[in-house]
Amino acid sequence: KYYSTHRNNGDSIVTIPIQGHVSENIESSIETEVFTTTLTAGHYIVGIDIPVGTYSFFSKKGSGNLISDDGSINEIFDYESQVSSDIGIENFGTEELNNIPLTDGTILTVTSTQEISAGCEDGRVSELKPRNQELNEIELGYGLYAAGDDFDPGTYNVTWLEGNGNIQTNPYDSDTGINEIMGEKTATYDELQELNNKLYIRSFNNLILNEGDILEINDIKIKLTPSK
């Protein structure tokens, strides 16, 4: 049973039992549906990029971290134990994570070359909100760029255009920033090609650049496109 309290003539508290199905009716009014997506390197805000729900995650390709800003997830994903075999450490990473509730506003981050299948059966898809940003697309080459001076602060998708090198934010925040190697995934020798596939990415989703953040770009050219 559930109870509510009321004052009796302003002098005392009277506890009145009410029916236990009230909260159930409230919960049943929430619309949910099956939701699936593939997550690659980037940040994903629950309620904007993916819906609130209880998720399962499965590695599809590559290796990297899957973390959340609330501390509920902090895992290394390693598809088919590729990195584990390379460094000779058993159980270096995982390929699967189940029954993880994600609440509104949580930031989920995927790093490096990892591709993760994410899905839930109770996704509150109808509650997803757009960012509604009024930002411009911009191309940037080698150098240091400040949000607020060289481009507007906001959330951007990063696309590699040319070169091979590192891109990072300063100060670096794992929940909003970037520290990745971007470049071409082609090589002459098979061994070098395999190494490239484990290191280089060509896109990064939803990089959050706040006023005063510095974007450091080394030996590559990239494009910033406003995230939707």
Please identify what each model-predicted range represents.
Residues 1-37, 60-138, 161-228:
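Primarily secretory-pathway and cell-envelope proteins
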Residues 40-42, 46-54, 141-143, 147, ...:
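A glycine-anchored, Pro-Gly-centered beta-turn/N-cap motif
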